[in-house]
Amino acid sequence: MLFFVAGSMKDRYHTLEIGRLGGAVREMGELDNTVFIYIVGDNGTSAEGGMNGLFNEYTYFNGVAESVADMLAYVDEWGGPTTYPHMAAGWAVAGDTPFAWTKQVASDFGGTRNGMVVHWPKGFAAKGQVRTQFSHVIDIAPTVLEAASLPQPSSVNGTVQAPIQGASLVYSFNDAKAPARHTTQYFEMFGNRAIYHDGWMARVVHKLPWAAQPITKLADDTWALYDTRSDFSLANDVAAANPDKLKERQALFLKEAIANRVLPMDDRGIERVNAALAGRPDLMAGRTSLTLHSGMKDMSENVFLNIKNKSVTIVADVEVPAGGGEGVILAQGGRFGGWSLYLKDGKPTYSYNYLGMQRSSVTAQDPLPAGK
């Protein structure tokens, strides 16, 4: 039920806000000459909930498994403000019908394909029609530029711009049978990779969305081949019957991967969120101390010390009023994971919240006296 309620709420919200935007443009007298491009969806449904679902999605992002027993303890709270639940993967697969896979599986249309609506009365005469030419999100910028009769920028504020990839979709607006101009496209995420070319799709499913580790090593992956012209949902693997075509597509993927800096391929998952583990530049890299002042709140995690799984020392200058102090001194995170240093009944207390599954606190015996 939660799955359908959430979808219904999103649909109503989107409909309302799009209606407001359209109404404002209509009042300006520019509705017929305004290009509306509405992409419906978010690269498939989310399967991170695994086989049983989650009461706190942050457990997934921290690589911590939830057991059914863990979740049953929250059965009466499920869906309320004390949980941050995620549906089971079965719901995600059902939501991506007729495709086999979900978000994160960039090598399947279930993890990439979305509907799109274009509205531009002065730009084309067709109404209520469907276009089937292959297209990709990188086609949107060229489409907008052509519709507005603008050239692709060669530089912005003195910075030379890389050429915009993709092909404008304007050619298809008044010609449903026009040959597709976007004929080749690579896909890759977490080692899940594919290449589309002239109606054929070669792909690898390397890592499942709910799994901590890939299925195999990258070098041991098995490729599949599909003819999307007759197999919309990628249901029939024809690699065995077309070995030469599969080899051609594999070589083409490698060419595109090199050209678009996909290599070296990184099939890690959660580790890539942590800059120190991922090996990428980090604003706070090497910092061992940080000074904060009163009023500094709602700071992004990227501008705070990474203290995960580390011992830390917190030194706080506080002024305790007469009658005792109360309240938070420093906190990171919240209900679904984090820690806090605060005064409770005047006593310094440190609390650690392990992803909502376990809470630990240490409290001083005596309250702080008044003064600094």
Give each language-model segment a name.
Residues G22, N33-V35, S46-F61, K127-G128, ...:
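Short, solvent-exposed loop/turn and secondary-structure capping segments
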Residues E27-W120, R203, L208-Q213, G279-M284:
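Histidine-centered active-site microenvironments of extracellular/periplasmic hydrolases
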Residues G7, D11-H14, I18, V25, ...:
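Beta-strand elements within well-structured catalytic alpha/beta cores of enzymes
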Residues P81-F109, F124-Q133, V137-T228:
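C-terminal cap/loop subdomain of S1 sulfatases and analogous C-terminal strand-loop tails that border
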Residues Y354-K372:
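Short, aromatic/His-centered strand-loop micro-motif at the edge of beta-sheets
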Residues G19, A24, T313-E319, K372:
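Residues within well-ordered beta-strands of beta-sheet-rich folds
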